[in-house]
Amino acid sequence: MEPRVGNKFRLGRKIGSGSFGEIYLGTDVQTNEEVAIKLESVKTAHPQLSYESRIYRVLQGGTGIPNMKWYGVEGDYNVLVMDLLGPSLEDLFSYCKRQFSLKTVLMLADQMINRLEFIHSKSYLHRDIKPDNFLMGLGRRANQVYIIDYGLAKKYRDSSTHRHIPYRENKSLIGTPRYASLNTHLGIEQSRRDDIESLGYILMYFLKGSLPWQGLKAGNKKQKYDKISEKKVSTSIETLCRGHPTEFASYFHYCRSLRFDDKPDYAYLKRLFRNLFIREGFQFDFVFDWTVYKYQQSQSGNPQPRPHDGGVGTSSGLNPAVGNSEKRPDVPNQRTNPDFTLKQKDKNGNDSAIAKDKLLPGSLNLGRSEGSSSRRVVDTSSREPFSGGSDNANYETALKGIDGLRINNNAGDETAATPQSNGDDVEPQSKAL
């Protein structure tokens, strides 16, 4: 008899694992829809799936928040059934030779800021902002960024009164050291400003290919964390952002100007990057670097190793990155966005245009389902520049992630630090994914 959970979901092959347990591909036996099933032993020392499921319930309905389909106990396991998602940004970064173009970084940044704004609006901090925890969707949501893994999330204010948690020091480092804010390294209680600063480090990681504090050698984890902290403190914002648009330095200066209980001006941060996007003459066409790279590989007839199958998100290694400073050649736009008034120019200065069947040959499995709506990129509201709807005739072929992508990542040089038992953190003491 085939294994089932919740009397509704058929358990399939394993697609990932983490400190919490394992992730399996599953199928809804009623709809035949594929899902991701997270299993955690009920005997684990620090169970976290129950805690995470409660946070998912709070966040349900938000754009870029995976849908939780079922949570319960089956035999010896706590079980969480969720949407099946595509590759993580870490996997896609590796697929693209460990560097993203400015255009891709800006398209991602807009959505990632929106994700943090939504989580914060629900009175929670994420506290483990890293590329592994941002995944692309599948099907008509393939251009949508999702944020996962709430095992280290913490409520920072009362939902009714909005009273903020108190400022405290001498806190243990919680999160992934590579992307932790300066204040987190200094032992200061985390707040909204720290999630935002961590996102800034991700953006620079994508642009530069690596961060200055990667690959440091140390005898143990504490020494490693101390060295990362020292290097991060000694690296000025200008040094970190050298060679890249000044908007990135402005982003960090703003983050570090925030007081502990300040609400970040998310609209200002999005406006910084949207104005840069416009000034560069980019088009919000959702042609990310991985789309370009797969297209080039299909044309060269020499496909490269590919990222993992889509899942709810398996943690990939965070090895020291090697930057690739070469710009990728232009590729024709997948579509034309009628709402966007700027055009991209080809090498001769002309507006580029190409038939869709030229960009998407039959051998290139980039799209399967239909639909995605779009918004003008200069709109500074909190809505997405696109909603992933199914009624946009101008975008008939939505990216479906990258089918069958696989990446083999080795163990990273940094892992997420977990809360220590200090009597004041009520969240789980273990880290998933």
Curated annotation (Swiss-Prot):
Catalysed reactions listed for this entry: L-seryl-[protein] + ATP = O-phospho-L-seryl-[protein] + ADP + H(+); L-threonyl-[protein] + ATP = O-phospho-L-threonyl-[protein] + ADP + H(+)
Modification after translation, per record: Autophosphorylated.
Functional note: Casein kinases are operationally defined by their preferential utilization of acidic proteins such as caseins as substrates. It can phosphorylate a large number of proteins.
Binding site for ATP: 15-23, 38
Recorded GO MF terms: ATP binding; protein serine kinase activity; protein serine/threonine kinase activity
Underlying gene: CKL5
Entry EC number(s): 2.7.11.1
Protein name: Casein kinase 1-like protein 5
Low complexity: compositionally biased ranges: 362-375
Stated family: Belongs to the protein kinase superfamily. CK1 Ser/Thr protein kinase family. Casein kinase I subfamily.
Record note on quaternary structure: Monomer.
A single GO cellular-component term on record: cytoplasm
Localization terms from the record: Cytoplasm
Modified residues (Phosphoserine): 390
